[in-house]
Regions:
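A compositional/biophysical signature of low hydrophobicity enriched in polar/charged and small residues
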Residues: 1-78
């Protein structure tokens, strides 16, 4: 069974994106996390076995110190 994936876009306090990327990468379920130039500050690819697990991963990320806003987009398989 394929995992459910989503992109999570984070806005952070400045300075801080590089420090926060390091912390985001430690969260189980994070596939990739990258700092960006411009807004949003960070883009994260996350995955879980189902939407509930995906929600848990996203909640752990957005609760990290320095994250001020987030937007999540579940990937639609075609």
């Amino acid at each position: 069974m394929k995992k459910v994936q989503a992109y999570v876009f984070l806005d952070t306090v400045n300075p801080g994106p590089m420090r926060i990327v390091v912390e985001v990468r430690k969260v189980p379920g994070v596939v990739r996390a990258d700092a960006l130039f411009g807004a949003p500050d960070i883009m994260v690819l996350v995955e879980g076995d189902d939407l509930s697990q995906l929600d848990d991963v996203i909640n752990r990320i957005v609760e990290l110190d320095g994250v001020v806003d987030s937007e999540s987009k579940v990937i639609r398989r075609v």
